Amino acid sequence: MKTDFTERHHRFDQCGIAMYLDSENWLKGSVEYENETFQHLGSVVTNHGYSDWATTAIPADVKVLWYRFSRREDDYCIECSPDGEAFTQMRVCHMWEGAGRIRFGIYACSPEDSSFKAVFTDMKLTDCAWKAHDGQQPD
């Protein structure tokens, strides 16, 4: 899925992908604007109410990003790409309650006194692109 967040302008403006089971069990991958110099490419994983946040700084001039979200039973992978072709891993995680039915999709938020336009395009449901490894069910 492609995100265009050209119009973000306020600290903490963010958009990306999310998987939601309930308020105690969810994950997200996104870009969060910080300032004119950098922003955070990151993920949050919440299991049984406990969250962690993993980030890396990327230049603030990155305004378009693609995401790929994959699942193998109760393990999940979030990847990103500047062009929708060459994806790199952002996060692999285990969701303790994530083996059953899930809800997933897009999200955008501007948690401070602000708003911005995020554009989401090219969302596709495909076969799992995350290749199996030893001990996992094959494709």
Locate predicted features:
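Extracellular glycan-recognition regions
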Residues: M1-D139
